[in-house]
């Protein structure tokens, strides 16, 4: 099993699909990485040579932020927005949608499950 950027890639999948198991790498990024590393995208992960794995790892290390570093960077960006008190930071803090969506009816993913409010007695 090939281990790249601290992630074990599934042996039976093609390399371009296997690379997407790394956080921060999608299909397009995987294709670009393989092109830069001069590796055939249709090769299975189990058929990769040690040299090819090293070339792929080198390209990822040089050009991309992946896995823990990327997660940390995103968390720090959100924390910075909250500290400066901008609109996006406030929305993050309140757990509401950040990108301008309406919240009257939907937005349940960000808000969480409904909390029922008791009716006032007359």
From Swiss-Prot:
Domain of life of the native organism: Bacteria
Residue ranges of the region described as Disordered: 95-122
GO cellular component: cytosol; small ribosomal subunit
GO biological process, alphabetically ordered: translation
Alphabetized InterPro entries for the sequence: Rbsml_uS13_C, Ribosomal_uS13, Ribosomal_uS13-like_H2TH, Ribosomal_uS13_bac-type, Ribosomal_uS13_CS
TM segment ranges: none
Role of this protein: Located at the top of the head of the 30S subunit, it contacts several helices of the 16S rRNA. In the 70S ribosome it contacts the 23S rRNA (bridge B1a) and protein L5 of the 50S subunit (bridge B1b), connecting the 2 subunits; these bridges are implicated in subunit movement. Contacts the tRNAs in the A and P-sites.
Sequence similarity: Belongs to the universal ribosomal protein uS13 family.
Protein name as annotated: Small ribosomal subunit protein uS13
């Amino acid at each position: 099993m090939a281990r790249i950027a601290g992630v074990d890639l599934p042996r039976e999948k093609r390399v371009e699909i296997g690379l997407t198991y790394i956080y921060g790498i999608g299909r397009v990024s995987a294709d670009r990485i393989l092109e830069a590393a001069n590796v055939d995208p249709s090769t299975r992960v189990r058929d990769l040579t040690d040299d090819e794995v090293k070339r792929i790892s080198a390209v990822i290390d040089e050009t991309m932020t992946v896995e823990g570093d990327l997660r940390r960077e995103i968390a720090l960006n959100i924390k910075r927005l909250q500290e400066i008190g901008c609109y996006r930071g406030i929305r993050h803090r309140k757990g509401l949608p950040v990108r301008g969506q309406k919240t009257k009816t939907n937005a349940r993913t960000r808000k969480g499950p409904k909390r029922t409010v008791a009716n006032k007695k007359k």
